[in-house]
Amino acid sequence: NNSYYVFIGLSNPTGAPTLAGYGRTSDWNTSDKTPAPTDSFSYRAHSGDTMMFGKKISSANIRRIIRRVDWTSGSRYEIYRDDYSASNQSPLTKANRLYDANYYVLNSDFKVYVCIDNGSTGDNVLGNISQDEPTFTDLEPSKAGNSGDGYVWKYLFTVSPSDIIKFDSTEYITVPNNWSTSTDSQIRLVRENGNSDTNLNQLKHVYIENAGTGYANGLGQEVDILGDGSGAKARVDVVNGKITDVTVSAGGKGYTYGIVDLGTLNSNVSATGRAKLIPIIPPGLGHGSDVYSELGTDKVIIYARFDDSTKDFPIDTKFAQVGVVKNPTKVCLLYTSPSPRDS
């Protein structure tokens, strides 16, 4: 098994030949300029020269993290889409990939939600402003209130109180460890709901890219969603020949692509009046089945506390070097004072 340690080093000399700064002449504390690391093989090879103390990292002191996106009333958020790219950037952040878009939020109770719908269409690409803070823990996507802001959210998890205390950051959100095997009741419910045969690649949202013209007027007209899955249906509202709303009435299962079949509604639609409806494909098996891939947890945060509880760590010294080392080995255990005759 591999072992990892947080280390600190490059202590600041005080001018006197103290043990902490022995053999070095730089005095970065007086200039208040911490020496910057150098991106070179030489720097990496010699980074161990100034390491002084280390602390072993346990699973309790490391978490996956994602960018922190706080829910704020009056702000806009982007919807989860499986097809953000350089040619189809997210509308608000202009992200070339999903993980750089603001498609999830952290609420005031440290609950995390994915945005399934924000009222956006091809005629309203930025979507609506969010007015209702999501607070529910329902397994199915839901609206957060009665303002009519058009937002639909999917609850994923709640940051635990212990993680808030240990890892709280203004820049990042911690994600629970061991998602696929966790026995936490709330995590298990969300995970199993996403993993269930019923929710296997189940569709939750259809985006109206183009409302079209000439369609048969009517509210709640049910149509099939075709593709490599089965069983999905949608209810379509048409007013004055234009599609104004599409709601998934049956999510089906097994979809990696989908096409809304408007054949029963388009008898009077011209070639230039055809609508474009895009079923949004969920992540993996379904929302919540694997939050690491759904949220893009490509970073970790590590907690390590150095104090004088063992009486061998100088708490009155500043350090300019911090890092992580894998499988360190002991090269010596004793310090021997050089002989006066040594040259």
What is the meaning of each model-derived region?
Residues 149-337, 341-343:
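Conserved, function-critical positions that sit in or immediately flank catalytic
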Residues 1-198, 274-276, 286:
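Tryptophan-rich substrate-binding surfaces of secreted polymer-degrading and adhesive proteins
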